[in-house]
């Protein structure tokens, strides 16, 4: 069940030498915070990212173990080298935590550099990896910034809150307001400062609440999504736990998006029909003097208002958009990882996407917290060519819908013109515009009423088309599919000529995410509404 869910990832940074007498207070403070988060998000699995260094790191890992929070270890170097930093009394604690960890991620050294040449750089890389891939950074810190090293706790807090450090290997911290630091006051050994274990939230707490709420909402709904689904990749690749997790969440997001898309389109259809019914019944009430039509008009209007209110309360439109955005971002990430690329989608999301859907940005960060891909595989058939064919066929389907809508609008226009000139001819021949009509008819007002009703019906039909097909953004979608089909065709040709380069894969991923963001931007303008 948890495979389909986005984990709430708690990153750890802290001092190597907290005061021994504060150990119990600090451990209790960490356990309280973890328990509070679990209570706040009961459907969301929690994972701790921790380097397991002596001092605060090991203390937090042990607190997490006591409250049942999973652990992913992030080591700055190979375990055998890392263990040299540990005193004998802490070495057993380290090895036990590594044994219970879900996974052990070793941050690779800078290309061409020996692992022991710049240990501070390696520790900084591990700290920044944790910072980037966490929803919340839990900092056991004394709050002091002077005389701090580049890889120390203060530097990591600064990176989390201001994005102050640009890590190596292309890692980049995201927008500062999308990451919150929970500061646990932690005096160092030899300090006389009071207040050990005092909690303080640094960063945008309102933004954190939004991210937690959206993540919890998705995970609760993911429990109702069907299990499994057709894999995008060969079955043999399921051994990669990061890819397996990403694909499971992607399938849940895709299933939920389709569910809410059906609800959204059904709502749009109902509102279009009811809006048309309101206009038509009022027209008959007004022109045909059918008094009872006003009752049908009121019933249709009430039903439309109830439908609109229900759609807004269910939030189906937003969920449809955001879950599709999540599914698309994960699909792109899945192909990148399969290809052996180290590009992570959260690093290339557009600024607009980061602002509008910070919870998706955080989800991608959490789901990319794993070992770097080791194998390089050909993705031309399973990604490039399949996506080209998808956009080609989707463009054709959208063009078909657009042509049907255009034909109906054209027909409505012709009918309106014919009825308009028919009305002029009627008035010229039957008495409205001529003092001595050549073709006087009896009951002229009845015929005039019928003509008005016919003209009004054509207008009502046009209103229906605008209320339903107009919300589908067919022309925009058709253009987007054409552009993306051309992109995949061009990239496929370049891969044939130059090979599957990292630059081409990143370009492709960036363009797909940009298209995803563009789609969400204009789709947000198509929220359900009642047009009368």
Regions found by a protein language model. Give the residues of each.
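Acidic/glycine-enriched connector segments
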Residues: 1-194
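Conserved non-transmembrane functional hotspots
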Residues: 200-414, 421-532
């Amino acid at each position: 069940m948890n495979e389909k869910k986005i984990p709430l990832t708690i990153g750890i940074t802290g001092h190597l030498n907290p005061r021994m007498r504060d150990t119990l207070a600090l451990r209790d403070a960490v356990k309280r915070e973890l328990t509070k988060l679990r209570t706040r998000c009961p459907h969301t699995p929690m994972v701790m990212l921790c380097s397991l260094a002596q001092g605060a790191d090991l203390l937090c890992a042990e607190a997490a173990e006591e409250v049942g929070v999973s652990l992913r270890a992030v080591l700055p170097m190979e375990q055998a080298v890392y263990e040299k930093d540990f005193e004998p009394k802490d070495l057993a604690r380290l090895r036990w935590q590594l044994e219970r960890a879900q996974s052990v991620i070793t941050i690779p050294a800078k290309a061409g550099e020996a692992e022991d040449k710049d240990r501070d750089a390696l520790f900084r890389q591990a700290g920044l990896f944790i910072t980037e891939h966490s929803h919340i950074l839990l900092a056991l810190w004394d709050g002091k910034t002077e005389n701090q090293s580049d890889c120390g706790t203060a530097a990591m807090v600064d990176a989390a809150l201001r994005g102050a450090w640009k890590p190596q290997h292309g890692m980049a911290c995201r927008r500062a307001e999308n990451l919150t630091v929970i500061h646990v006051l932690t005096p160092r050994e030899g300090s006389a400062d009071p207040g050990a274990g005092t909690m303080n939230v640094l960063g945008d707490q309102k933004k954190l609440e939004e991210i937690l709420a959206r993540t919890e909402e998705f995970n609760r709904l993911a429990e109702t999504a069907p299990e499994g689904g057709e894999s995008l990749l060969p079955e043999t690749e399921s051994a990669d736990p990061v890819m397996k997790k990403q694909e499971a969440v992607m399938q849940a997001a895709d299933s939920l998006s389709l569910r809410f898309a059906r609800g959204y389109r059904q709502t749009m259809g109902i509102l279009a029909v009811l809006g048309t019914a309101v206009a038509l019944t009022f027209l008959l009430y007004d022109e045909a003097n059918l008094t009872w039509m006003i009752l049908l008009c009121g019933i249709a209007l009430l039903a439309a208002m109830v439908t609109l209110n229900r759609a807004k309360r269910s939030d189906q439109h937003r969920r449809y958009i955001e879950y599709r955005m999540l599914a698309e971002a994960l699909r792109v990430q899945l192909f990148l990882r399969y290809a052996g690329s180290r590009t992570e989608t959260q690093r290339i999301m557009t600024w607009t996407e980061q602002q509008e859907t910070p919870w998706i940005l955080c989800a991608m960060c959490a789901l990319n917290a794993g070992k770097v891909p080791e194998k390089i595989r050909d993705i031309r058939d399973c990604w490039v060519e399949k996506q080209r064919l998808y956009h080609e066929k989707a463009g054709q389907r959208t063009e078909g819908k657009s042509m049907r809508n255009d034909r109906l609008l054209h027909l409505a226009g012709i009918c309106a013109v014919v009825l308009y000139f028919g009305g002029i001819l009627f008035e010229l021949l039957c008495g409205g515009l001529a003092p001595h009509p050549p073709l006087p008819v009896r009951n002229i007002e009845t015929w005039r009423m019928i003509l008005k009703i016919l003209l009004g019906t054509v207008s009502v039909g046009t209103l229906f088309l605008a209320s339903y097909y107009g919300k589908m953004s067919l022309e925009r979608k058709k253009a987007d599919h054409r552009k993306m089909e051309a992109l995949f065709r061009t990239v496929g040709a370049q891969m044939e000529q130059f090979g599957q380069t990292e630059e081409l894969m990143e370009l492709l991923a960036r363009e797909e995410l940009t298209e995803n963001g563009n789609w969400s931007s204009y789709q947000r303008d198509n929220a359900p509404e009642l047009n009368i």
